[in-house]
Amino acid sequence: DWKRMNGGDKIQTQISAIISQYNFEQPGASVPALVTLYRAIKNLPVNSWRDKKLVETQELIEACAALFSEASTGQENVIQGDVLNLSFFLNKRNDVKATLKHIRLDNFDSAFNVPLLLNTNVTFNTTIQVAPDKKISQPYWLIYPKEEGIFDVRDQTMIGKAWNDAPFIAAYTVTIEGEDFCIKRPVQYKYVDPAKGELYQPLVVLPQVESSFTRENYVSLNGALLP
């Protein structure tokens, strides 16, 4: 109940007005009022409830603006210390004022200041150098050696997750109706299946493996094992 919070009465009034004036045929018309609501919530004292409602309000703004964004790669996996090819994509399908200001990802940072036109694709391709010590992708219960009869899971917040957190997160800074929003998207492996179309799956980070030989030449007869 917003009335329990200091200044919550005005916010409740704004929410009621947005709901009553919402037009499902033109959801973009609600974006200016939602941005005003977002600013009002942001001015409240910092607490978990405020932060939760900011996230939810931003999600509503993105949905009503029909703003689609993704970060993808054509590589199924990448090795520590290797190069990762990236593709960024944005499209705004409703008529609201929006501008792409920045895209950030690890050591990559690029300024754009590109107005997002109605239903016009904005694409950008680049490559980044993966850090040699980048955390590899593996089940969270195998990060540490197994103890007798039990797995050593030191980060209890990981328990129950179907997938690990994405190793790379792209952060788009988009200005909507004069307010800056940070929109985060995981970098996913994107490919096309002839029958199913575009598909996504988590990007995997593999460890760097090096090998060396003790002799210059090896000869194996009929696939026999070498000594």
Predicted regions, residues:
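Eukaryote-biased detector of low-complexity, proline/serine/threonine-rich segments
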Residues: 119-186
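Short edge beta-strand/loop segments characteristic of extracellular beta-sandwich folds
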Residues: 85-93
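Short acidic, flexible loop segments centered on an aromatic residue
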Residues: 93-110
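Hydrophobic residues positioned within well-ordered beta-strands of beta-sheet architectures
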Residues: 69, 86, 101, 124-126, ...
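Structured, charged N-terminal subsegments at the starts of enzyme catalytic cores
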Residues: 14-17, 86, 107-111
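Low-complexity "stalk/linker" and mucin-like segments enriched in Ser/Thr/Pro/Ala/Gly
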Residues: 109-121
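Low-complexity, acidic Ser/Thr/Pro/Gly-rich terminal tails and inter-domain linkers that flank the onset
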Residues: 38-82, 108, 190-226
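The feature marks non-catalytic terminal segments
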Residues: 1-62
